Amino acid sequence: MNNDYGRKLELVTFDKGTGLEAVSHYQFYTGTSVVRCWTTLTNKGSEVQTIEYMSSFALTGVEKEGLKKPEDKMKIWVCHNSWQRELQWQDYTLEQVGLASSAKPTEQRSSKVFACTNVGNWSAKEYIPMGVLENTEAGSVLFWQIEQNGSWHWELSDVGGHFYLQLSGPSEIESHWYKNLVPNESIESVKCAVGSVTGSFDKAMDELTKYRRKIRRRNKDNQRLAVIFNDYMNCLWGDPTAEKEFPLVDAAAEAGCEYFCIDAGWYADGFWWDEVGEWKESRKRFPNGVKEVADYIRKKGMIPGLWLEIEVMGIKCPLVDSVCDDSWFFTRHGKRVYDRSRYQLDFRNPKVRSHADEVID
C-alpha cells in the first residue's frame, strides 16, 4: 500500500502452536534508503501466551556480499556514550568482537553474540541506540537506530552459515520485561529504522539524517529555536542564591536569552543532592522567595523556569520518614532501591501521583 510517506509493506505470519499472529511492518520513505520497522503480535489462540522477546527487525545474511571471509571484510561500528563522554564511535572487526570464522561456512553456528543493550529510561547511558555494519569489500553499509527512550537491545551473531542482525526493545533476559498476552490482545514492539547505502560511514549518516528530518513532527521549534540560559552547567553547579541569580539574569537578558532556568539546589539549605523531593524553596537561599527572582526574570523580558526532578526523592528528604512508606518507592527483595543516595518514586501508587500534582499546583 502507499501512504503519505511512501510505500508500506505488512507481512503476516502465524504460529499454529501458540495461536500468535505477527505482523511485520515496513514503512518506506520516499527519497531515502531507510525503512521504519516494527512488529505487532496478536494472540488469536485460546490461552494466555507469555511474550519474553519481540524483535522489531531481523535480517539473516548481512555479510553475504563479496567473496572474502566475513572477518576479512566486515566492520561493526558502535557508538559508546556516557555522562560527559558522548558519541564515541568506534569500529571493530568481527574477530575483535569474538565472531571470527571457526568452522566451514555451512556449519558456522557459534554461541557467541555481540550485543549492545540498555536497561531503563536513560536510553543512552552507555551506548547510543544505533549501529553500523560496513562491508569493506562490497563498499556497502547497513545502519540502524532503535527509536526507544527506554530499554533496548541489538545483537549480531551467526546461525546457519550466515550472520544475522536483530533489533528490539526490552526483553526478559536483558531487561526483565515480559508480557502476558491474553486471547485477542495485541502488543506492538518499539520502532526502529534500518537503511543501506553504497559508500562510507559518513554517507550512511547523511541518509539517516534525511530520514530523521522526514519523521520529525512539525512544531514551532522547526522554524524558531528559543535561546535558553540554565544556571547549572559551568556556572552555579547546584548552589543558587538570590544574590547570585540577579547578576546572571542581567547578563542573560543582555545576551538576548528568552528563557532563564533556575536549576538544582533552590529547595535545600545545605547540600542539595540527597535532600531533593519536597520541592519547597529554601528561605536561606532565597530570603524573599524564589518568586522574587522569577519576577525579576520576567521584568527583564524573559520567561522563568524552575528545575524539577519529580521522579526521585533523596534519602535525607524530610518526607521519606514522615509521610512515605515503602509503597512509594521501587523495591527489590523487599527493600527500597536507592542509587547515589536517592529513591525512585513508583507512580503506580496514587499517593505518589497526588504528591506530584501538589508540587506542580
Please give the residue ranges for each predicted region.
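Polysaccharide-binding surfaces and accessory modules of carbohydrate-active proteins
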Residues: 1-159, 175
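Acidic/aromatic-lined carbohydrate-recognition and catalytic surfaces
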Residues: 51, 267-322
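Catalytic domains of carbohydrate-active enzymes, especially glycoside hydrolases
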Residues: 244-267
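Short, structured beta-strand/loop micro-motifs enriched in basic residues and often containing a Trp
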Residues: 163-175
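Conserved, mostly hydrophobic/aromatic
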Residues: 39, 184, 229, 252, ...
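Hydrophobic faces of well-ordered beta-strands that scaffold small-molecule active sites
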Residues: 189, 225-231, 258-262, 304-308
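Active-site-adjacent "subsite" loops/lids of carbohydrate-active enzymes
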Residues: 224-226, 237-240, 283, 310-361
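Short Pro-Gly-centered flexible turn/kink motifs
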Residues: 179-198
